[in-house]
């Protein structure tokens, strides 16, 4: 995988802060959320890797970047939500994320977390 240029957009919201990260070539994107009332946790969301780029290490780049950014922000945990039993669920588990609760709004989704400090 070649080096990929990214564009990062920051937004301060009523509930906290959001960082949107998009590859210039549109090969991947993700977002990180930090809520004002939970400074120890970063939420990884909206993860997408373009179909023709899958299996080339982009997912690892996203996780490594997210975990590094979370540490810089002083967080000790990253949380994310995935479809229970999906490929993504298994993939995150292989990368050290553990299930910790079902999603109350949609029980077909599960919350996962990883301690990063």
Predicted regions and their residues:
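Acetyl-CoA-dependent GNAT
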Residues: 1-45, 50, 69, 105
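Conserved acetyl-CoA-binding loop-helix of GNAT-fold acetyltransferases
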Residues: 49, 55-68, 94
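A general lysine-centric signal
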Residues: 34, 113-114
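Conserved GNAT acetyl-CoA-binding A-motif
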Residues: 70-83
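Conserved beta-strand-loop-alpha-helix junction that forms the acyl-donor binding cleft
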Residues: 80-89, 104-109
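Conserved acetyl-CoA-binding loop of GNAT-fold acetyltransferases
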Residues: 93-102
């Amino acid at each position: 995988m070649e080096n990929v240029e990214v564009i990062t957009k920051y937004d301060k919201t009523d509930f906290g802060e959001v960082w949107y990260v998009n590859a210039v070539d549109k090969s991947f994107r993700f977002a990180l959320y930090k809520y004002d009332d939970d400074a120890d946790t970063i939420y990884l969301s909206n993860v997408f890797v373009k179909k023709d780029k899958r299996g080339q290490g982009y997912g690892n780049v996203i996780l490594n970047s997210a975990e590094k950014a979370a540490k810089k922000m002083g967080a000790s945990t990253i949380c994310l939500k995935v479809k229970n039993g999906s490929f993504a669920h298994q993939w995150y588990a292989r990368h050290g994320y553990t299930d910790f609760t079902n999603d109350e709004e949609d029980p077909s989704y599960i919350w996962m977390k990883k301690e990063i400090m």
